[in-house]
Amino acid sequence: MAPNIRKSHPLLKMINNSLIDLPTPPNISAWWNFGSLLAMCLITQILTGLLLAMHYTADTSLAFSSVAHTCRNVQYGWLIRNLHANGASFFFICIFLHIGRGLYYGSYLYKETWNTGVILLLTLMATAFVGYVLPWGQMSFWGATVITNLFSAVPYIGQTLVEWAWGGFSVDNPTLTRFFALHFLLPFLIAGITIIHLTFLHESGSNNPLGISSDSDKIPFHPYYSIKDILGLTLMLTPFLTLALFSPNFLGDPENFTPANPLVTPPHIKPEWYFLFAYAILRSIPNKLGGVLALAASVLILLLIPFLHKSKQRTMTFRPLSQTLFWLLVANLLILTWIGSQPVEHPFIIIGQMASLSYFTILLILFPMIGMLENKMLNH
């Protein structure tokens, strides 16, 4: 029999073992589609970003006009920009759903895969933040000012840290240039960490909705899941293109149509929608350092999840009490997102504080307690 190049060639062999002959559980649901969707988002963002970078000028006096020029005068420049801006939103929608799936089905028990995933989330957040500054509109400028200023809360070295990040005594040209450099670099770092993420995943194989071993009953990835991934992609592409083509500015801030002006502060400074939950937690603590610590904890808490798993069952499929708590957490995050978009006044302040408190309470206290309670109930 002739040797199969797919299985013998050093490079093709790696692709084959990851995407073609990969043994996969036969019962993974559509919730397992988001990994491939995230990969597609990353590819789309890198390609559109590369095309935008060809027409962008990282200079405070030219950045805003260079983006306007791209949209007006470059062939399909408006389309490339709208795909890139809304692609970021879909990237976050997919990663939030992907993390939600991991929480619900106990995928976090693959600790290395989970931890590299958290690192990916942090890198994605950093990339989105520096990217938002590049068009140099009002919200770009003031968002950069407010968020970089948070570093000054670090005891002793805070102010030095901020000035070092700014490259001066305020957000100015050096800040914009370095943010562009970082925004160009980080997606490739994300691609690298993604490969590590997949390497760890393929060490153990995929989890499944039942949370039990499927080693005795695996099927090849291709054609079963390759076709399912293509279906998932078309289903994501429909709302994505609808948004990017029919209402491209729906998720953006109107303030960003005004060029950056250091002398005029916008009435409400708020980040893009995908950061609002963390922004609400930051604002709910009236102390600067406390707020920064809560902000960091709101994402880094994910690293603790594997250690807070007290249930004898891996997934929540057969745990109705934990399911209720999970959906309570989802509702809580939606409330935080809404609060983050509102001005700092009554009743939003107290709602934000209650929602922030319940966010940490659910994750740190209630999940482990309910897990142990369910174990006890199973014994009776």
Swiss-Prot record:
Residues that hold a ubiquinone according to the record: 202
Keyword Heme found: yes
Residues that coordinate or bind heme b b562: 84, 183
PROSITE patterns membership: CYTB_CTER, CYTB_NTER
Cofactors (names): heme b
Keyword NADP assigned: no
Keywords associated with the record: Electron transport, Heme, Iron, Membrane, Metal-binding, Mitochondrion, Mitochondrion inner membrane, Respiratory chain, Transmembrane, Transmembrane helix, Transport, Ubiquinone
One GO cellular component term: mitochondrial inner membrane
GO-annotated biological processes: mitochondrial electron transport, ubiquinol to cytochrome c
Chain residues that bind heme b b566: 98, 197
Outcome of substituting residue 29 to F: In strain: Isolate French
Assigned protein family: Belongs to the cytochrome b family.
Additional observations: Heme 1 (or BL or b562) is low-potential and absorbs at about 562 nm, and heme 2 (or BH or b566) is high-potential and absorbs at about 566 nm.
Main function: Component of the ubiquinol-cytochrome c reductase complex (complex III or cytochrome b-c1 complex) that is part of the mitochondrial respiratory chain. The b-c1 complex mediates electron transfer from ubiquinol to cytochrome c. Contributes to the generation of a proton gradient across the mitochondrial membrane that is then used for ATP synthesis.
Protein name as catalogued: Cytochrome b
Organism: Coturnix japonica (Japanese quail)
GN (gene name): MT-CYB
